[in-house]
Each structure stands twice: as structure tokens, then as C-alpha cells.
């Protein structure tokens, strides 16, 4: 079974550890099943967590966009919205191709959720989409 995590973030948020802990829990409590969990790395945002991911045997799928989070404007309302628009245009087609090619059983959506939800409405995937909202 393939489980992919969509959680692109533009600043440090607790959701990153929620994703890592979720994958660790799936691996720990599903010993009878062969479950392959992967995090989709949209714009190199997961590179600063690579050591933690490697330590926990968590694979990443590089979307290979030309975007780099360290070079994108993230502070302020308008600048962050501009970044969200860039992420949309640079990632929507690549995410669609990954879902079509890899055919994950589940796509767990954490952040910037409108991109996979738009794809869900446009295409008939076999993949089940799970929208997970963290916080309060």
C-alpha cells in the first residue's frame, strides 16, 4: 500500500512534525501490512528535515520544481499569497503526473490543500484523498 503526504510549508510550522509522527505511527502500528509512506517535497521545503526523515526511514518524492523556498517571499500577507500562486502553477501538473504514475492508495493532505483538492475535482483518481487539518 502506498501512502503519500502532501504538506508543502512556507514557514516553520508544527505540521511538519505531525506529518513525521503520523508516518512513524503508521509504520509502527501496521506491522502486518506492507505500507510505503512518502512525503512529497514541492519546493525543497523538506530539505532542512532530511536528517530526521532519513533517521526514520521516510522517503521523499521530489517534485523537481524550479522553486526554492529559501528564495521565495514568505513574510507578509501579499508576499505569501504570491508564493502560494507560484506554488500552484509550478506544482499542480507535476502532482497530477505523480498521482497518475505512482497511483498511491492514499494522499494525505496537510497544507496548501487547494492544489490536490482542485485535482480531485478535475480527475477521477483511484487514490483516496484525506484532508487532515492540524491546529486549533
Model-identified regions with their sequence ranges:
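N-terminal strand-loop element at the rim of the active site
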Residues: 5-13, 25-82
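An amphipathic, basic-hydrophobic alpha-helix
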Residues: 70-106, 122-123
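Conserved donor sugar-nucleotide recognition element shared by glycan-biosynthetic enzymes
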Residues: 15, 19, 88-91
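Short, well-ordered alpha-helical microsegments
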Residues: 46-49, 114-118
